[in-house]
């Protein structure tokens, strides 16, 4: 058993959560490393990182440790040497429990100022050296200025270790107390807490006078790197994350989950006030505000608990003009300033009973554990979420329209009501929207839908006001994820003259919008809704790069809309693309443009593409992207051209094998054969099946051949079922 005995009661808990033992470096000259082989310090926490790690008065002093097994105060055969690290803790390897380590006062001496036990106490047990922890990957970092105080496994055992086994490296599961899993504790813990224990919680805290790690006090004395922590007085409780013993410091009692509206602290009477003031006693990393991220609820001691967030100035956003409220959407009242409301709780006194007055601004918004700003809410919005049975109208939310617009369910409520609202109700809601920054609302994830509804259901005056807000910002809105939707809706519902004014702001930014994941939708909507004569600046920008944009993930969409809607310019666009058809057919995005030409192009355009397909039928049919074009070609060509494809597949060979057999076994070309079966007349289909059916046994061996077999069987069943019907008609 390994027992930690803290030699410095004032040593602070400064070990970080998931780092090794990074002691502050010190010059070699300032350290006395003599006699390290006799008594070596353990890797326990030192003083605070912000303070000096070494004390000059302690470095130069001599320390006396007794030999022998006598546990009384007699000092026999003392060995004196200089300890360079007086704040470290020594380990005992004799297997005794902490209770057997009795501390007794030491008589004053001349060099008492260097005693590593300032309280006048020292251990009576002999302290053999720690051995061979150097190779342990968990404990392997030491100051560069210090000699590594560990014996290698290959080294011979010194005389001071003659009484120990030759291989004394302890298992990781036995280090630093009683750990019951392979995860172990990465960091030794002094476990000497300045706090008084919580009532009935001796399994978690220790006495202020004795550092203990035995099973009597800590069945598992650390939760670092462990999923389960077993309190002595309760059944095992599941913890989703890791923390350590002292992480009960900033937990506040609340009852949010149960919906209760009161805050009643229920701490035990012995709860020390210093516990609430302490930031973290654990080895887990802390947030910037000092709170530990691993504070967890413990139902065995506390009915409901939550982390107290830190009050922080409001973030810079359009919500600055909105009412300030607390963490969970309830504004604090100003009528009773002395009332203290714990963050994350809902006092009954602030809940409205019958009125829906606007929220009164209170303290700045709170910051949650992830550093995100809490959405500021009003009383009405809270009741809207809390009371699902109440029937709300637009008149009930007046004064809170912007807040509702930026809320998911509130925005949906406004959208539904605006579709059937009266003109007066729409105007009242619109006045609140227009009085704020509409641009910010247009770029909001939920607010943009409310603005869109006013382009759809609003009157001309309201549309003009919104257009005045958009003017000068069309390009920036077009590149924004939610703002581009508002611009599209505006183009769709405003008058033609306003459409031209709006889209003219994109002159000089056409290619920027075309190649943007959001802006390309605005260009598409403009091509769909605005006359081609007013879009010449767009077509001029597209024409020199039209074959390049056709292979662009966003540009290909714009080219398809141009081919579909720009009738006067369609011929010029296709003529620019025809020399690049074969390359575009094999492109991941360009193949969609070629398919669009087959669907909307002239017969001469289709004929040109078909001739290219028939010349490279096998290659294109086995291509991942080009096979889509071949399938589309089969659907849109004439029966005569389709017969040409069938004859080529049946008659020609490649690599001493029929093209049909190669295509049936290919993972892409087999879909071309299936498409040919679907699109061909019955006579040609039966001919194709007659060539496929003899190879059914071979196709069963291929994964993709099985799909074709299913199609063949389906058509054969149709043919068989059709024969009796013809026979019955002949008999009649």
Swiss-Prot record:
Principal cellular location given in the protein's record: mitochondrion
Disulfide bridges in this chain: none
Keywords for this protein: Cytoplasm, Membrane, Mitochondrion, Mitochondrion outer membrane, Repeat, RNA-binding
Alphabetical list of PROSITE patterns matching this protein: PUM (PS50302), PUM_HD (PS50303)
Cellular component terms per the entry's GO annotation: cytoplasm; cytoplasmic stress granule; cytosol; mitochondrial outer membrane; P-body
UniProt KW Transcription regulation keyword: no
Gene Ontology biological process terms, A to Z: nuclear-transcribed mRNA catabolic process, deadenylation-dependent decay; positive regulation of nuclear-transcribed mRNA poly(A) tail shortening
Compositional bias (Polar residues): 100-109
Record has Repeat as a keyword: yes
Source organism, top-level taxon: Eukaryota
Transmembrane domains' residue ranges: none
Region (Disordered): 98-123
Miscellaneous comment as given in the Swiss-Prot or TrEMBL entry: Present with 846 molecules/cell in log phase SD medium.
PANTHER family: MATERNAL PROTEIN PUMILIO (PTHR12537:SF12), RNA BINDING PROTEIN PUMILIO-RELATED (PTHR12537)
Annotated family: Belongs to the PUF3 family.
Main function: RNA-binding protein involved in post-transcriptional regulation. Predominantly binds to mRNAs encoding mitochondrial proteins and localizes them to the vicinity of mitochondria for translation. Regulates mitochondrial biogenesis, motility and morphology.
UniProt protein name: mRNA-binding protein puf3
Organism: Schizosaccharomyces pombe (strain 972 / ATCC 24843)
Taxon lineage: Eukaryota, Fungi, Dikarya, Ascomycota, Taphrinomycotina
Gene name linked to the record: puf3
């Amino acid at each position: 058993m390994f027992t930690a005995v803290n030699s410095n009661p004032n040593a602070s808990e400064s070990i970080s959560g998931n780092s090794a033992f990074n002691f502050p470096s010190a010059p070699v000259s300032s350290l006395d490393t003599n006699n390290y082989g006799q008594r070596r310090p353990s890797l326990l926490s030192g003083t605070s990182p912000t303070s000096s790690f070494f004390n000059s008065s302690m470095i130069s002093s001599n320390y006396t440790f007794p030999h022998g097994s006598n546990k009384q105060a007699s000092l026999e055969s003392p060995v004196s040497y200089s300890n360079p690290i007086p704040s470290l803790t020594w380990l005992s390897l004799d297997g005794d429990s902490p209770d057997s380590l009795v501390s007794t006062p030491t008589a004053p001496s001349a060099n008492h100022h260097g005693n590593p036990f300032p309280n006048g106490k020292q251990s009576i047990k002999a302290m053999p050296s720690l051995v061979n922890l150097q190779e342990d990957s968990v404990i392997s970092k030491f100051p560069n200025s210090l000699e590594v105080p560990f014996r290698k496994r290959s080294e011979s055992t010194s005389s001071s270790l003659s009484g120990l086994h030759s291989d004394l490296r302890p298992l990781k599961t036995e280090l630093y107390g009683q750990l019951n899993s392979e995860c172990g504790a990465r960091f030794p813990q002094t476990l000497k807490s300045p706090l008084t224990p919580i009532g009935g919680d001796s399994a978690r805290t220790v006495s202020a006078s004795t550092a203990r790690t035995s099973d009597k006090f800590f069945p598992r004395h650390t939760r670092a790197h462990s999923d389960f922590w077993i309190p002595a007085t309760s059944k095992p409780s599941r913890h989703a994350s890791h923390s350590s013993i002292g992480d009960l410091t900033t937990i506040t009692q609340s009852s949010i989950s149960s919906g209760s509206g009161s805050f009643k602290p229920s701490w035990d009477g012995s709860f020390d006030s210093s516990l609430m003031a302490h930031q973290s006693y654990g080895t887990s990393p802390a947030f910037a505000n000092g709170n530990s991220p691993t504070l967890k609820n413990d139902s065995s001691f506390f009915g409901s608990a939550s982390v107290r967030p830190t009050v922080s100035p409001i973030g810079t956003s359009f919500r600055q003009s909105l009412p300030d409220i607390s963490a969970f959407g309830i504004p604090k009242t100003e009528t009773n300033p002395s009332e203290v409301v714990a963050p994350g709780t809902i006092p009954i006194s602030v809940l409205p009973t019958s009125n829906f007055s606007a929220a009164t601004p209170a303290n700045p918004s709170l910051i949650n554990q992830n550093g995100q700003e809490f959405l500021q809410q009003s009383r009405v919005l809270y009741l809207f979420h809390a009371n699902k049975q109440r029937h709300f109208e637009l008149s009930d939310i007046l004064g809170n329209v912007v807040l509702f617009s930026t809320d998911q369910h509130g925005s949906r409520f406004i959208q539904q009501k605006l579709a059937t609202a009266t003109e007066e109700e729409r105007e009242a809601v619109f006045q609140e929207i227009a009085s704020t920054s509409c641009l910010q609302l247009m770029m909001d994830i939920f607010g943009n839908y409310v603005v869109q509804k006013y382009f759809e259901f609003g009157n001309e005056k309201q549309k003009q006001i919104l257009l005045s807000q958009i003017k000068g910002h069309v390009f920036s809105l077009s590149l924004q994820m939610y703002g581009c939707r508002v611009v599209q809706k505006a183009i769709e519902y405003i008058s033609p003259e306003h459409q031209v004014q709006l889209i003219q702001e994109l002159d000089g930014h056409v290619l920027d919008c075309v190649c943007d994941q959001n802006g390309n939708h605005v260009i598409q909507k403009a091509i769909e809704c605005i006359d081609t004569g007013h879009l010449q600046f767009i077509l001029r920008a597209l024409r020199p790069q039209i074959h390049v944009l056709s292979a662009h993930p966003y540009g290909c969409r714009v080219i398809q809309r141009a081919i579909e809607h720009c009738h006067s310019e369609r011929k010029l666009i296709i003529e620019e693309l025809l020399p690049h058809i074969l390359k575009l057919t094999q492109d991941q995005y360009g193949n969609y443009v070629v398919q669009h030409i087959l669907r909307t192009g002239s017969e001469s355009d289709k004929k040109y593409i078909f001739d290219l397909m028939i010349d490279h039928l096998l290659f294109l049919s086995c291509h991942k992207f080009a096979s889509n074009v071949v399938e589309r070609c089969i659907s849109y060509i004439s029966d005569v051209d389709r017969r040409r494809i069938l004859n080529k597949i049946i008659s020609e060979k490649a690599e001493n094998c029929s093209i049909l057999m190669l295509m049936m076994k290919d993972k892409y070309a087999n879909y071309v054969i299936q498409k040919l079966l679907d699109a061909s007349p019955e006579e040609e289909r039966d001919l194709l099946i007659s060539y496929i059916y003899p190879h059914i046994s071979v196709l069963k061996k291929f994964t993709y051949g099985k799909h074709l077999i299913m199609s063949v069987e389906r058509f054969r069943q149709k043919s068989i079922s059709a024969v009796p019907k013809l026979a019955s008609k002949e008999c009649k």
